């Protein structure tokens, strides 16, 4: 082989090696980017547009996302209602947690929607309460007027439908049921196409606060004794909805609890460690959600609260047991501090017993009180 041909082959080989190195480096960068984009991701199904659940999910993402170490990234998805959120949690790929109403379990059991639902779902923590808003046209005086009227309950898998259906059923009211979303129902209510809408959402709901001030609608009180056995008492006041409630007045209603639900991953499942990592970060940074400009309902959330009828996810239970509440430090009596400092300064080598110190201090306190009169 001639020298020029050998040189040509060597040059070609070097070019190919260089191209391979560039390609390998580019592929490596792509793999790194793919890994970073997916590691630590937790899929959270929240609530529909305008809901308190969506606000909560957005707050959580802002506080918990970690783009520096890629340990946690919350991917928030708009939900279609509490029943659909359960379906997404069970079957939708990339969904790890969901915000759902606690009464959804009773609804699923009663209607036999899923087998072994108690073994499939767990909760991480109780979240906010969702109040029942019974919005009506101005000519509706009380709930009995809803018989035969056009009442929107929301889509069949929504929390409003689940809770609203129970409310009407226990009240013995048969209405012309509509299944529009809450936002669509409000628009129809404003123009008279329906007579009422039952919306279950945490107060203050932006669905109501964003209405024009001259909306002409009313919030009816809800005081059903049968519902009160299942749900919590609540009220609306002027601070919640200035255009619905006069200063100094309240409107009674009921509320349903919500939880951060999670699929019951077994500890040996590959998703379990990531779920546990998310829970550790969420609980560790929880106090940040109770301050600042986040939704006001965070202030009432107690991550240690038990939820009747639900079982807590094992990783969440472990974190709470490993991080017990520290007892409040006993209140320090300034006078006692001064007394102890005086004894230490004047009699450093004394052998006072605790009982003798206490007796001497009480005599000193009585003497001081007498001299200050």
Q: Whereabouts are the PLM-identified features?
A:
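Bilobed "Venus flytrap"/periplasmic-binding protein-like clamshell domains
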Residues: 39-67, 72, 130-187, 191
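Ligand-binding clefts/hinges and TM-proximal coupling segments of bilobed small-molecule sensing domains
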Residues: 28, 156-167, 234-308
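A structural signal for short loop-to-beta-strand junctions that line the ligand-binding cleft
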Residues: 115-127, 244-251
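Pocket-lining segment of extracytoplasmic ligand-binding domains
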Residues: 102, 112, 173-270
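Pocket-flanking alpha-helical
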Residues: 62, 75-116, 186-188, 204-211
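An extracytoplasmic/periplasmic, membrane-proximal ligand-sensing/linker region
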Residues: 184, 201-215, 219, 264, ...
């Amino acid at each position: 082989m001639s020298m020029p041909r050998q040189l040509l082959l060597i040059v070609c080989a070097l070019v190919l090696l260089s191209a391979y190195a560039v390609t390998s480096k580019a592929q490596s960068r792509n793999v790194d980017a793919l890994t970073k984009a997916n590691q630590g991701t937790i899929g959270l199904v929240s609530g529909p547009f305008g809901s308190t659940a969506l606000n909560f999910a957005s707050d959580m993402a802002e506080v918990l996302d970690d783009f520096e170490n890629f340990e946690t990234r919350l991917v928030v998805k708009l939900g279609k209602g509490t029943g659909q959120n359960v379906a997404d949690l069970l079957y939708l790929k990339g969904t790890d947690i969901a915000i759902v109403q606690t009464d959804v379990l009773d609804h699923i059991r009663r209607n036999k929607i899923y087998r072994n639902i108690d073994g499939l779902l767990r909760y991480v923590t109780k979240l906010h309460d969702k109040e029942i808003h019974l919005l009506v046209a101005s000519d509706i005086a009380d709930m009995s007027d809803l018989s035969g009227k056009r009442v929107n309950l929301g889509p069949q898998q929504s929390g409003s439908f689940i809770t609203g259906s129970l409310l009407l059923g226990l009240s013995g009211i048969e209405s012309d049921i509509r299944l529009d979303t809450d936002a669509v129902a409000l628009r129809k209510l404003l123009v008279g196409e329906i007579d009422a809408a039952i919306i279950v959402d945490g107060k203050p709901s932006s669905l109501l606060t964003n209405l024009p001030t001259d909306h002409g609608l009313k919030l009816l009180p809800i005081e059903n004794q049968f519902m009160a056995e299942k749900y919590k008492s609540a009220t609306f006041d002027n601070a919640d909805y200035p255009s619905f409630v006069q200063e100094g007045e309240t409107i009674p209603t009921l509320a349903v609890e919500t939880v951060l639900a999670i699929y019951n991953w077994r500890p040996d499942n590959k998703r379990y460690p990531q779920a546990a990592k998310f829970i550790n970060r969420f609980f560790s940074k929880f106090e940040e959600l109770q301050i600042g400009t986040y939704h006001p309902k965070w202030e009432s959330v107690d991550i240690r609260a038990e939820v009747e009828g639900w079982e807590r996810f094992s990783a969440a239970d472990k974190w709470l047991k490993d991080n017990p509440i520290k007892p409040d430090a006993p209140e320090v009596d300034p006078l006692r501090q001064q007394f102890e400092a005086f004894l230490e300064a004047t009699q450093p080598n004394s052998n006072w017993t605790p009982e003798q110190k206490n007796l001497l201090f009480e005599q000193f306190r009585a003497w001081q009180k007498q001299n200050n009169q």
